[in-house]
From Swiss-Prot:
It catalyses: Hydrolysis of (1->4)-beta-D-glucosidic linkages in cellulose and cellotetraose, releasing cellobiose from the non-reducing ends of the chains. GO terms for cellular component: extracellular region. This is Probable 1,4-beta-D-glucan cellobiohydrolase B. It comes from Aspergillus fumigatus (strain ATCC MYA-4609 / CBS 101355 / FGSC A1100 / Af293) (Neosartorya fumigata). It comes from the Eukaryota. Its EC number is 3.2.1.91. Residues 496-532 form the CBM1 domain. InterPro entries: CBD_sf, Cellulose-bd_dom_fun, ConA-like_dom_sf, Glyco_hydro_7, Glyco_hydro_7_sf. The gene is cbhB.
Length: 532
């Protein structure tokens, strides 16, 4: 509680200071390259199975952009080092430097088409670009804010070209909808230029935070030619829907004492970028579900139950205690759909850690068995994660390699000095020598990930639980509105009988209430029962 209160006071102080600085010392916008956001559609669905297509856009994060002196082409930042003549301190740097528009395909390897977004790993133009991080936008100056309590989030993904050491991550963070522009008048770039990022690691590698540069105390990275760390970090709650390559995957909630964006200082930030990992106000570890780590070593991967050699659908459900969007988050469930078949998440096989979803009971038992610090509970657990989901979060789609731990925490044995037979150590089949960024960048420059077919709606509305079509079993009709398309999902219960994992009851449910043999209708809450 003390940490939470302290963070809130720091946050309010930062707001006041930013306002006092005025527009004379501002994070500027360049004029050399027009910023044109690639279009990407996604769908919002209703309980009846009707889905409306939204014409969204994506924007690349400010950290990837060219930063140059206002009025000419002199770099403010080259490689992993600031020009201290232009940038002697945070405020002066923000006043002197501008973020430039992006050429998405040729510079960053980002291509969008319809409901699909492809992110290439290495792209070489005038400079070599590694990976990318993009946000879904509502319009050209505002991020789309997703509120997922009592909802499910569904998307298709192709990870077939992601080897060991890479992470195609799709997740949510509690950024400000305008990128912090209204809170911090010195931020003149805003969401249009991808500002305002934060996550549960309280990253200190950001070049700009709260409308100021992060040059003070900046230390160039010893193993990343493009990055470094400054005195400040940017914290907020994070819901990792999907962190994956073709070998391993995990989904992980990360709560914070204050759900929204808060600036931190030095090692008090905690997380990956600080000497005291658990010294901050966020949970850097989260409560993860990695099927391999939970004991099922044949569930996810090439040729396995979820076959990563081809595209599949990922369904994540955020279930509340009362079945409403104002309830308390009590469970995060996961399903997959591939080749017309609904695949439930694998069960944990460890004695004492049961289930195939994230609950408070699962997290407590898992942390105990794996001998991990229960920082998840300390920072609010599922209730804390639910607070962030309730206020709205920004969708992030990214591809990255790991200069801190070579992604071994996702796809190999970690820590590498521990025995692979120790509970929680083995996370995938990748060798402990794999994932070194220099090696991955040299050997797999053609790696890529594709995200597509994003749908959001009430539990059971975004995919066909009867299992006839991995895309949701929908038929499409065009409405008279020029910017929307309405689709209607096929009946998840078939001909009067709900199939495995289909809805079979709940307040307001008018579909089938009988389950196909041998399944029975089990009540999850007053509003949703499911064939299990």
């Amino acid at each position: 509680m003390l940490a939470s209160t302290f963070s809130y006071r720091m946050y309010k102080t930062a707001l006041i200071l930013a306002a006092l600085l005025g527009s004379g010392q501002a994070q500027q916008v360049g004029t050399s390259q027009a910023e044109v956001h690639p279009s990407m559609t996604w769908q919002s669905c209703t309980a009846g199975g009707s889905c409306t297509t939204n014409n969204g856009k994506v924007v690349i994060d400010a950290n990837w952009r060219w930063v140059h002196k206002v009025g000419d082409y002199t770099n403010c930042y080259t490689g992993n080092t600031w020009d201290t003549t232009i940038c002697p301190d945070d405020a002066t740097c923000a006043s002197n430097c501008a973020l430039e528009g992006a050429n998405y395909e040729s510079t960053y390897g980002v291509t969008a088409s319809g409901n699909s977004l492809r992110l290439n790993f290495v792209t070489t133009s005038q400079q070599k670009n590694i990976g990318s991080r993009l946000y879904m936008m509502k319009d050209d100056s505002t991020y789309e804010m997703f509120k997922l309590l009592n909802q499910e989030f569904t998307f298709d993904v192709d990870v077939s070209n992601l080897p060991c050491g890479l992470n195609g991550a799709l997740y949510f963070v509690a950024m400000d909808a305008d990128g912090g522009m209204s809170k911090y008048p010195t931020n003149k770039a805003g969401a249009k230029y991808g500002t305002g990022y934060c996550d549960s690691q309280c990253p200190r590698d950001l070049k700009f935070i709260n409308g100021q540069a992060n040059v003070e105390g900046w230390q160039p990275s010893s193993n990343d030619a493009n990055a470094g760390t400054g005195n400040h970090g940017s914290c907020c709650a994070e819901m990792d829907i999907w962190e994956a390559n073709s070998i391993s995957t995990a989904f992980t909630p990360h709560p914070c004492d204050t759900p929204g964006q808060v600036m931190c200082t030095g090692d008090a930030c905690g997380g990956t970028y600080s000497s005291d990992r658990y010294g901050g106000t966020c949970d850097p570890d989260g409560c993860d579900f990695n099927s391999f780590r939970q004991g099922n070593k044949t569930f996810y991967g090439p040729g396995m139950t979820v076959d990563t050699k081809s595209k599949f659908t990922v369904v994540t459900q955020f279930i509340t205690d009362d079945g409403t969007s104002s309830g308390t988050l009590k469970e995060i469930k996961r399903f997959y759909v591939q080749n017309g078949k609904v695949i439930p998440n694998s069960e944990s096989t460890w004695t004492g850690v049961s289930g195939n979803s994230i609950t408070t009971e699962y997290c407590t038992a898992q942390k105990s068995l794996f001998q991990d610090q229960n920082v998840f509970e300390k920072h609010g657990g599922l209730e804390g994660m639910g607070a962030a989901l309730a206020q709205g979060m920004v969708l992030v789609m990214s591809l990255w390699d790991d200069h801190s731990a070579n992604m071994l925490w996702l796809d190999s044995n970690y820590p590498t000095t521990a025995s692979s037979t120790t509970p929680g150590v083995a996370r995938g089949t990748c060798d402990i020598s794999s994932g070194v960024p220099a090696d991955v960048e040299a050997n797999h420059p053609d790696a890529y990930v594709v995200y597509s077919n994003i749908k959001v709606g009430p539990i059971g509305s975004t995919f066909n639980s009867g299992g006839s079509n991995p895309g949701g079993g929908t038929t499409t009709t065009t409405t008279t509105q020029p910017t929307t398309t309405t689709t209607t999902a096929g009946n998840p219960g078939g001909t009067g009988v709900a199939q495995h994992y289909g809805q079979c009851g709940g307040i307001g449910w008018t579909g089938p209430t009988t389950c196909a043999s041998p399944y029975t209708c089990q009540k999850l809450n007053d509003y949703y029962s499911q064939c299990l």
